[in-house]
Regions:
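N-terminal "domain-start" segment
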Residues: 1-91
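Functional cores of ribonucleases/endoribonucleases
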Residues: 57-141
Length: 142
């Protein structure tokens, strides 16, 4: 029985010209690592949010300062993600889930808010070492 040698990726496509790792994205602030809180919410995979999700939904708007905090807003997001995973709305490598966030009224007035139902996307892909990890992003992000 003859074994054929498998062609490597470098042989097929040439050497990697540039790679931007998840670790670098977290260090640069492009991704926000929320793994510890995600584990508390029942999510087993390392988890990160895109900077856009963090700024748009986790960071507390100025008019809601003192009424909400980032930890509570993050918990709401991760709890709803965990519920979507348990309900099998996140299947395969991606899916969407909904979270309600208190957002400033228009025009902004201190302490006055309206609830906004937001649809976010969760993608499961490889971490730098090839193990699975989760990234939460806005639906328009990739």
């Amino acid at each position: 029985m003859k074994h054929e040698r498998q062609t490597t990726m470098d042989e097929l496509f040439g050497p990697v010209i540039f790679a931007y790792t998840r670790k670098e994205a977290i260090a640069d602030g492009v991704l926000v690592d929320v793994t510890e809180t995600a584990r508390e919410a029942g999510i087993k995979l390392p988890t990160a949010l895109t900077r856009a999700v963090f700024e748009d939904y986790i960071r507390v708007p100025e008019s809601l300062q003192g009424f909400q905090d980032e930890a509570g807003r993050l918990w709401d997001l991760l709890w709803m993600l965990a519920a979507a995973i348990r309900a099998k709305r996140i299947t395969g490598d991606r899916g969407t889930f909904k979270v309600s966030f208190a957002m400033p009224a228009s025009p902004p007035r201190m302490g006055v808010h309206k609830n906004r139902l937001v649809t976010l996307k969760a993608v499961c892909g490889p971490a730098d070492d090839g193990s699975p990890c989760m990234t939460v992003m806005e639906r328009t992000e990739d």
